[in-house]
Amino acid sequence: MFRFTTAGESHGPALVAIVEGLPAGLPIDVEQINHELWRRQQGYGRGARMKIEQDRVEIMSGVRHGLALGSPLALMIENKDWENWNAVMAVEPTELAPEKSRRVKRPRPGHADLAGGLKYDARDLRNVLERASARETAARVACGALAKQLLESFGAQIRSHVIQLGGVPAKPLELKFEQIAAIPEEAPLNCGDGEAQREMMELIDQKKAAGDTLGGIFEVVARGVTPGLGSHTSWDQKLDGRLAQAIMSIHAVKAVAIGAGLEASSLPGSEVHDEISYNDETKEFIRDTNRAGGLEGGVTNGEEIRVRGHLKPISTLRRALRSVDIDTKQEERAAFERSDITVVPAAGVIGEAMVALVLAEAMREKFGGDSLGEMKRNFEGYREQLRGY
């Protein structure tokens, strides 16, 4: 079993998470978690909140002397902005003057504001947007960093890159894993095409001046994942379905593609399916192409897993769209909350975390074990089985 849950509001005192299922003896590198949190905050076009928050994780339980205990791991990420919101977000009953309450009553089109308000009968839409905020993904990235550390113990690596922002595509769209890993961390948009990246930045500047926002496409690539994770036997065990749900759960993602994705629907089968051959030296079945994106029948096939997330533009616009005041029912401009112009590079980092969490769950299902040593013995036994197939 492997699972995680997060809690916390955008302007509350902290984000917290609990991760269950890490095997005892797994080395836990706190600075690696902090580095992933730093990566999430980078990217040209981010808002002022990123200048306030300097995310650092504090592990509260489940680790001793740098090793996982096998018990639930609890972690916390403080919200530095809490000091500016402690009255508005107080736990205790508090009477605030209307001008200080920061009540939200003009829902933003495209956001959870109105749908959440209707569902939970919230007359202050702040009760919805505080949890619906993408700030929650900081906790997911921390959990994903732990999942990455587990996967790395078994030779798997995960990276992401931006392949399109607005209407500007990178060229080529598909990079080798080594090329993606070689993109400098200081690259403003985590894009492997320098010329396209400059065009993207110019477009961001234009939309910022116009009070608008931008979406785009990121790709997550996982290398070194063993064949046989997931299952063809039941719909909810198919790994491609689980990965798609995980990526779709990221704020603003409206479509997910695996491998050739949407393009495959317009091509003949002879140009889509990856022909199989056998390597006598490595004792492995291999493919010269990877249009399946590393998954066939809901099961990993040993090739790189390639998943793309398509993001809509952020729903908080400085040039606000038309909306309705939920009190008066009169037409108004939507509320404005401090926000970004685009988050595609950060969404890629979050995508890495979600892919890592799904793969870690699949690894624990497949290989079990209470300790890392036991899990590795099970893994090696399976690898020996594959070599004899």
Model-identified regions with their sequence ranges:
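Generic N-terminal targeting/processing segments that precede catalytic cores or assembly contacts
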Residues: M1-Y389
